[in-house]
């Protein structure tokens, strides 16, 4: 049985117990959230991983994307990136490999990390069609579902499936006058296939079969936003919202089949539109967990998109987003390296922490109080221990060491805290 089915029967699984403990949440509240589809625990029956709850009343979670490309493929490097992401606090990892050895990368990542691992199976179907026949659009329905079944069997915990890309939504996108068109790679694969074959998207027309596979392995479906905006000017347009309405219907069908699912969201979006978009998704998708990429709030910061995404992510999480997909400094420019992954994870953790502290979640608020106490007490070691990145602040402090262990080189003997303490 899936986690959802167990919850609906009132059964408590080991995964539920662990999530309730981590979140300091009443187990019955957690069970209700899973049963009604507002919380998911991605946990494939073929793989053991550290359980992670995503959704209503839980702390904001972070995903880190890694993966090879046709231009750069190194299995060991991808494993190193996955391990670095987990070390710096990612709650999940997605392998988005599109290189010839994508299966080997996936299996290596699944073995290397103990957090939930996600994939986008349409990449495998498209890449194999390209390598064998010369074009992504040469994949057929069997290729698509074969990739999904193989990855489910391998132990993948959650999968992005672009079932909301349909004949109707593709035609609507073509008429929309978008500046950036379709920027989702998986969405583009399927849109091109639909236009080439003039047939309905198999992941939509045969959604019931997709649900059967997901149910068998308890794979959490991440309903992909293939029509997410690729620039601020395209945000909140008709293609984006029409796809969201399709995804809302698919959420209901997944729940009817006892299959866990979450919904993916934008994307590039002006700051003033984020809160409304989060609330629209939560309303039309009946509280399904919302998994957002960023959102990136300005297109003017290549090389610094992790900062842009953290700004958007904080606003999104404060208004209902449950799962933040990190963005690295290499976004839009190159495949990220290990250091890019680290910086992306830290930026997203800052966003998640800011939102969770604003929501007054006990764990987040308590850690803020701990850090404040450590600073007031000049407890540098504790400050470094509490920090998302303990190495960087330590290195800054060591750049200009001074004899007094309490002081730093910024204020020295004119430290406000010390002056007031000594006056008292």
UniProtKB/Swiss-Prot annotation:
Q: Which Pfam families match?
A: ThiC_Rad_SAM (PF01964)
Question: Cofactor comment in the record?
Answer: Binds 1 [4Fe-4S] cluster per subunit. The cluster is coordinated with 3 cysteines and an exchangeable S-adenosyl-L-methionine.
Task: Read off the Gene3D superfamilies from this record.
Answer: 6.10.250.620, Radical SAM ThiC family, central domain
What is a single molecular function from GO for this protein?
zinc ion binding
Q: Which domain of life is it from?
A: Archaea
Q: In which pathway does it act?
A: Cofactor biosynthesis; thiamine diphosphate biosynthesis
One of the GO BP terms on file: thiamine biosynthetic process
User: Which positions in this protein are listed as binding [4Fe-4S] cluster?
Assistant: 408, 411, 415
Q: Which sites bind Zn(2+)?
A: 268, 332
Q: Which reaction does it catalyse?
A: 5-amino-1-(5-phospho-beta-D-ribosyl)imidazole + S-adenosyl-L-methionine = 4-amino-2-methyl-5-(phosphooxymethyl)pyrimidine + CO + 5'-deoxyadenosine + formate + L-methionine + 3 H(+)
Q: Which InterPro entries match?
A: ThiC, ThiC/Bza_core_dom, ThiC/BzaA/B
Enumerate the cofactors the protein uses.
[4Fe-4S] cluster
Residues annotated as binding substrate: 65, 94, 123, 162, 184-186, 225-228, 264, 291
Keyword S-adenosyl-L-methionine listed? The answer is yes
Query: Could you tell me the EC number(s) of this protein?
Result: 4.1.99.17
What are the TM regions of this chain, as residue ranges? none
Its keywords, alphabetically, are: 4Fe-4S, Iron, Iron-sulfur, Lyase, Metal-binding, S-adenosyl-L-methionine, Thiamine biosynthesis, Zinc
Role played = Catalyzes the synthesis of the hydroxymethylpyrimidine phosphate (HMP-P) moiety of thiamine from aminoimidazole ribotide (AIR) in a radical S-adenosyl-L-methionine (SAM)-dependent reaction.
Tell me which PANTHER family the record gives: PHOSPHOMETHYLPYRIMIDINE SYNTHASE, CHLOROPLASTIC, THIAMINE BIOSYNTHESIS PROTEIN THIC
Per the record, the similarity remark reads: Belongs to the ThiC family.
> What name goes with this protein?
Phosphomethylpyrimidine synthase 2
Organism this protein belongs to: Methanothermobacter thermautotrophicus (strain ATCC 29096 / DSM 1053 / JCM 10044 / NBRC 100330 / Delta H) (Methanobacterium thermoautotrophicum)
């Amino acid at each position: 049985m899936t986690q959802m089915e167990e919850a609906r029967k009132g059964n408590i699984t080991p995964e539920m117990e662990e999530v309730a403990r981590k979140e300091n949440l009443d187990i019955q509240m957690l069970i209700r959230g899973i049963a009604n589809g507002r919380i998911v625990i991605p946990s494939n029956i073929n793989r053991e991983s550290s359980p992670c709850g995503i959704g209503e009343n839980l702390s904001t979670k972070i995903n880190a994307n890694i993966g090879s490309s046709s231009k750069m493929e190194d299995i060991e490097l991808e494993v190193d990136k996955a391990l670095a992401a987990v070390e710096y606090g990612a709650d999940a990892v997605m392998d988005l490999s599109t290189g010839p050895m994508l299966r080997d990368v996936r299996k290596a990542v699944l073995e290397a990390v103990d957090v939930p691992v996600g994939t986008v199976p349409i990449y495998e179907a498209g890449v194999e069609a390209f390598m064998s026949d010369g074009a992504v659009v040469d994949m057929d329905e069997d290729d698509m579902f074969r990739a999904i079944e193989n990855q489910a069997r391998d132990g993948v915990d959650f999968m992005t499936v672009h079932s909301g890309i349909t004949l109707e939504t593709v035609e609507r996108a073509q008429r929309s006058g978008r500046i950036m068109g379709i920027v989702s790679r998986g969405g583009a694969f399927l849109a091109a296939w639909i236009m080439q074959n003039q047939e309905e998207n198999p992941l939509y027309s045969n959604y019931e079969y997709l649900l059967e596979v997901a149910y068998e392995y308890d794979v959490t479906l991440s309903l992909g936003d293939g029509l997410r905006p690729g620039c601020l000017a395209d945000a909140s347009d008709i293609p984006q919202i029409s796809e969201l309405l399709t995804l809302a219907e698919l959420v209901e069908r997944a729940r009817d089949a006892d299959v866990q699912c979450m919904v993916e969201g934008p994307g590039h979006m002006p700051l003033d539109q984020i809160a409304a978009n989060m609330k629209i998704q939560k309303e039309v998708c009946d509280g399904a967990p919302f998994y957002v990429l960023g959102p990136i709030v300005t297109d003017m910061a290549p090389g610094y998109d992790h900062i842009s995404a953290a700004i958007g992510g904080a606003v999104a999480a404060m208004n209902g987003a449950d799962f933040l997909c990190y963005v690295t400094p290499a976004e839009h420019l190159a495949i990220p390296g290990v250091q890019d992954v680290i910086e992306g994870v830290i930026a997203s953790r800052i966003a998640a922490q800011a939102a969770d502290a604003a929501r007054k979640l006990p764990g987040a608020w308590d850690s803020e109080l701990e850090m404040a106490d450590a600073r007031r007490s000049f407890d540098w070691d504790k400050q470094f221990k509490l920090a998302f990145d303990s190495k960087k602040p330590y290195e800054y402090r060591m750049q200009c060491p001074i004899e007094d262990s309490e002081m730093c080189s910024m204020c020295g003997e004119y430290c406000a805290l010390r002056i007031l303490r000594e006056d008292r």
